[in-house]
Amino acid sequence: MAVKVLVVDDSGFFRRRVSEILSADSNIQVVGTATNGKEAIDQALALKPDVITMDYEMPMMDGITAVRHIMQRCPTPVLMFSSLTHEGARVTLDALDAGAVDFLPKNFEDISRNPEKVKQLLCEKVHSISRSNRRFSSYSAPAPQPASAPAPAPSSFASSRSPAPAPAPARAAAPAASANSPAPKRKAYKLVAIGTSTGGPVALQRVLTQLPANFPAPIVLIQHMPAAFTKAFAERLDKLCRISVKEAEDGDILRPGLALLAPGGKQMMVDGRGAVKILPGDERLNYKPCVDITFGSAAKSYSDKVLAVVLTGMGADGREGARLLKQGGSAVWAQDEASCVIYGMPMAIVKANLADAVYSLDDIGRHLVEACL
């Protein structure tokens, strides 16, 4: 069955070109278009599309406001179009936090020339996020909290640094995959490495806000994201978390209580001296940054002292790096299917029998504390 798509943009040219590109795929059907956020809400309710492509700047109602309304009234996977600027990064992160699943740079020059790469990427993203639909509503909703639990983490990125909530106590009924996983083994890890893609910005926020300021292990983060976005993303996480978060620079020293985010468009490696190396992005690799590259360097530098975590994302990036980590005796965790936006990267870990444990997203931060403190 074809994926039904609603295209939302105030530019007639962009609506037409996006519709043409998507309609050229026999497995995608453009069921409608809208010129502003208000129309998008009405069309989403009437047409019940599988995926919505959404611009940000529009008259009457902007894209982020529309996404919030759609998530409340008819939760639907949204693919945001954004500009590759610092402001575009801020807006895109706001949209992801409001409930959008993924994003694509909005480049009129590229889309007007209709290059094959743009067509392929757009269609791949639509197909990928359409598969998140069956569990999308439950993922978008705040995680349930016991009556005695501390206040939950804010649903949006904080505008200023504030104390993060204490890790929530274990719930009585966890997803089956989590319930069957062993309790984490306490160990003096020298590094925690977390890799993710689609759905990662929100997932990383949920995990990192549960870590205390005195978290004893250095952390490296690999999120598939363009170069213009990673600095803004690191700054946002830093304002929300009790640990410090920054975009990694060449020569940065790994230290407890600090998370270094791999810069977009480049590769990040760690060395045995406790520093990171930032290398140019290799055009032969699909991902810049690439989880496999960072995991592989960690396996070489830290042997059995790494705790790797693979979160939501499409594809299989991280699997080969995790294999090297396992060969060296390190531990690998995967996010469970029920809490993933896209169960791709974690599934690759599980299917390759590389996962020491499979945990629900809301439990991973707590388990990191248990394993490392």
UniProtKB/Swiss-Prot annotation:
Subcellular location: Cytoplasm
CDD domains tied to this protein: CheB_Rec (cd16432), REC_CheB-like (cd17541)
Coiled coil ranges: none
Biased composition annotated in UniProt, kind: Pro residues: 143-153
Residues with 4-aspartylphosphate modification: 55
Alphabetized UniProt keyword annotations: Chemotaxis, Cytoplasm, Hydrolase, Phosphoprotein
Active-site annotation: 197, 224, 317
SUPFAM superfamilies assigned: CheY-like, Methylesterase CheB, C-terminal domain
Enzyme Commission number(s) of this protein: 3.1.1.61, 3.5.1.44
Gene Ontology cellular component list: cytoplasm
Post-translational modification: Phosphorylated by CheA. Phosphorylation of the N-terminal regulatory domain activates the methylesterase activity.
Single GO term (MF): protein-glutamine glutaminase activity
Residues spanning the signal sequence: none
Catalytic activity: [protein]-L-glutamate 5-O-methyl ester + H2O = L-glutamyl-[protein] + methanol + H(+); L-glutaminyl-[protein] + H2O = L-glutamyl-[protein] + NH4(+)
Enzyme class: hydrolase
UniProt superkingdom: Bacteria
The protein's role, per its UniProt record: Involved in chemotaxis. Part of a chemotaxis signal transduction system that modulates chemotaxis in response to various stimuli. Catalyzes the demethylation of specific methylglutamate residues introduced into the chemoreceptors (methyl-accepting chemotaxis proteins or MCP) by CheR. Also mediates the irreversible deamidation of specific glutamine residues to glutamic acid.
Identification of the protein by name: Protein-glutamate methylesterase/protein-glutamine glutaminase 2
Origin species: Pseudomonas fluorescens (strain ATCC BAA-477 / NRRL B-23932 / Pf-5)
